[in-house]
Amino acid sequence: MDWNGRDVISIRDFSKSDIEFVLKVAERLEEELREKGSLEYARGKILATLFFEPSTRTRLSFESAMHRLGGSVIGFSSASSTSVRKGESLADTIRTVEQYSDVIVIRHPMEGAARLAAEVAEVPVINAGDGSNQHPTQTLLDLYTIKRAFGKIDGLTIGLLGDLKYGRTVHSLAEALAFYDVELYLISPELLRMPKHIVEELRERGVKIHETTDLEGAIPELDVLYVTRIQRERFPDEEEYLKVKGSYQVNCKLLKNAKETLKVMHPLPRVDEIHPEVDKSEHALYFRQVFSGVPVRMALLGLTLGVL
């Protein structure tokens, strides 16, 4: 497939071969980075980062990825410093920013915002998260992290823990994992279960799924535990949030019942769902996961820019 100019909006737009291709390119770029420190593929190209919602890892890893490719970055980390405050529409913002850039990365609280941006823009658009909908680049780096840790994805038993209702990272990841021969444990409070339409789609695609509230019962079965925080900002009602706040914590006591090879992942930021004592254990994979964002986003930027 021709990647030059392609938008990256939803993991649903990817085939398994697309995913595997991105992971291979990312692996090659990681090796080149270790050898050379920085590359020149995107020299003369400009990335615009439009972050209408807070971000640390996604924004900085995209910026780092572009710099590592030899390109430049412009953008904003808060809509409060832009003409959006004056009432400018998203479409007009996109049409303006594309005059200055070769590729746009956007994070926005509105579901479908990235798709709208892609329809308006003539340069490629990459979705860095749209509300509780999709976060495709996080999914790709998650798959990359798993594959680097285990040498495979097929045959693994993976638990998704926490806010499965509002968490866009687990929505995208679950849909991507359906391409592989995996078994999924969906572990959450009743109020935060994975949306029914996603569960039904996964089952239709042949994924073996267990839905449970019991983390202790599930932990011995897992190869990967993917932890998410309870997304306070997505709750329409503070009382509903307080009902589920602090539902789970992953700590060393819990992990005594896990496989020695279990890896704990988290898209971060965390609040209290993983105790800091886990950080020094062999189970912790979440900071390696952070690193994975750079080669994976380098691959996506380079491919959509047509320089790889």
From Swiss-Prot:
<feature type="binding site">
    <location>
        <position position="229"/>
    </location>
    <ligand>
        <name>L-aspartate</name>
    </ligand>
</feature>
<comment type="function">
    <text>Catalyzes the condensation of carbamoyl phosphate and aspartate to form carbamoyl aspartate and inorganic phosphate, the committed step in the de novo pyrimidine nucleotide biosynthesis pathway.</text>
</comment>
<feature type="binding site">
    <location>
        <position position="107"/>
    </location>
    <ligand>
        <name>carbamoyl phosphate</name>
    </ligand>
</feature>
<dbReference type="GO" id="GO:0006520">
    <property type="term" value="P:amino acid metabolic process"/>
</dbReference>
<protein>
    <recommendedName>
        <fullName>Aspartate carbamoyltransferase catalytic subunit</fullName>
        <ecNumber>2.1.3.2</ecNumber>
    </recommendedName>
</protein>
<dbReference type="GO" id="GO:0016597">
    <property type="term" value="F:amino acid binding"/>
</dbReference>
<feature type="binding site">
    <location>
        <position position="138"/>
    </location>
    <ligand>
        <name>carbamoyl phosphate</name>
    </ligand>
</feature>
<dbReference type="GO" id="GO:0004070">
    <property type="term" value="F:aspartate carbamoyltransferase activity"/>
</dbReference>
<dbReference type="Pfam" id="PF02729">
    <property type="entry name" value="OTCace_N"/>
</dbReference>
<comment type="pathway">
    <text>Pyrimidine metabolism; UMP biosynthesis via de novo pathway; (S)-dihydroorotate from bicarbonate: step 2/3.</text>
</comment>
<dbReference type="InterPro" id="IPR006130">
    <property type="entry name" value="Asp/Orn_carbamoylTrfase"/>
</dbReference>
<dbReference type="InterPro" id="IPR006131">
    <property type="entry name" value="Asp_carbamoyltransf_Asp/Orn-bd"/>
</dbReference>
<dbReference type="InterPro" id="IPR036901">
    <property type="entry name" value="Asp/Orn_carbamoylTrfase_sf"/>
</dbReference>
<feature type="binding site">
    <location>
        <position position="268"/>
    </location>
    <ligand>
        <name>carbamoyl phosphate</name>
    </ligand>
</feature>
<feature type="binding site">
    <location>
        <position position="58"/>
    </location>
    <ligand>
        <name>carbamoyl phosphate</name>
    </ligand>
</feature>
<dbReference type="InterPro" id="IPR002082">
    <property type="entry name" value="Asp_carbamoyltransf"/>
</dbReference>
<dbReference type="GO" id="GO:0044205">
    <property type="term" value="P:'de novo' UMP biosynthetic process"/>
</dbReference>
<feature type="binding site">
    <location>
        <position position="57"/>
    </location>
    <ligand>
        <name>carbamoyl phosphate</name>
    </ligand>
</feature>
<keyword id="KW-0665">Pyrimidine biosynthesis</keyword>
<feature type="binding site">
    <location>
        <position position="269"/>
    </location>
    <ligand>
        <name>carbamoyl phosphate</name>
    </ligand>
</feature>
<dbReference type="GO" id="GO:0006207">
    <property type="term" value="P:'de novo' pyrimidine nucleobase biosynthetic process"/>
</dbReference>
<feature type="binding site">
    <location>
        <position position="135"/>
    </location>
    <ligand>
        <name>carbamoyl phosphate</name>
    </ligand>
</feature>
<dbReference type="InterPro" id="IPR006132">
    <property type="entry name" value="Asp/Orn_carbamoyltranf_P-bd"/>
</dbReference>
<keyword id="KW-0808">Transferase</keyword>
<feature type="binding site">
    <location>
        <position position="86"/>
    </location>
    <ligand>
        <name>L-aspartate</name>
    </ligand>
</feature>
<dbReference type="Pfam" id="PF00185">
    <property type="entry name" value="OTCace"/>
</dbReference>
<comment type="similarity">
    <text>Belongs to the aspartate/ornithine carbamoyltransferase superfamily. ATCase family.</text>
</comment>
<feature type="binding site">
    <location>
        <position position="168"/>
    </location>
    <ligand>
        <name>L-aspartate</name>
    </ligand>
</feature>
<comment type="subunit">
    <text>Heterooligomer of catalytic and regulatory chains.</text>
</comment>
